[in-house]
């Protein structure tokens, strides 16, 4: 298939592109910079959607970038980097004479309200209680297409675990030094997915015509607490992981974003499993062993 990927040059996009090309799909990227096998967002806006069978959007500024202060300017970048690119792709799909077979968007489990007791599947309510849940609601609304000529899929991703990027890249040094541990109380849930499975779900969604609607992009064993995750990462590295990161430190560094680390959701991939997708890394121990190998 001919696949157009928005934001395909980052940590997740690189893994997705590599898998798709390995499966024999022809991939073209939409990015800010021109280059071979790419079009720019401005070219997409001016010329419309190139001929393709599937469109995937992964674009979005990294919310947890520790080098950026959580101020009004950065909040606007977080919003516009997601909403504008999604609006643009959805508009291009709507206006083209040859619409793609599928349109796939990756959002986040921040849609669901943090809780120490509730369990969320794809039909659970959410999306209207803080900046991040409202962001996901607006993001998914921006992607909706009129009619049914194009199959629409939304993957709400958990924390993505993989080599060379993502959340775990910031954790490895202190954990390797034996200075790692739970964040805050450690009781909060930590919904996770191996990057190979997130890419795998996207590939499965574009190849399997019966897949549509919302899928939770988390591992079956992602009902893990932050403390359990810290212990598992320490074990994978052969290091102790008992030194907690105080919530005051997390709030000082991340501001309002700290809620994403200090609170969590128990999310299950009920509909994802029902589609028939087979996880490569359903369990945390094997996922971390692969990541730190």
Curated annotation (Swiss-Prot):
Listed GO MF terms: oxidoreductase activity
Binding site for NADP(+): 31-32, 58-59, 77, 82, 160
Claim: NADP is one of the keywords in the record: yes
Matching InterPro entries: DUF1731, Epimerase_deHydtase, NAD(P)-bd_dom_sf, SDR39U1
EC nos: 1.1.1.-
Keyword annotations of the record: NADP, Oxidoreductase
EC class: oxidoreductase
NCBIfam families with a match to the protein in the record: yfcH
Family note: Belongs to the NAD(P)-dependent epimerase/dehydratase family. SDR39U1 subfamily.
Primary role: Putative NADP-dependent oxidoreductase.
Name of the featured protein: Epimerase family protein SDR39U1
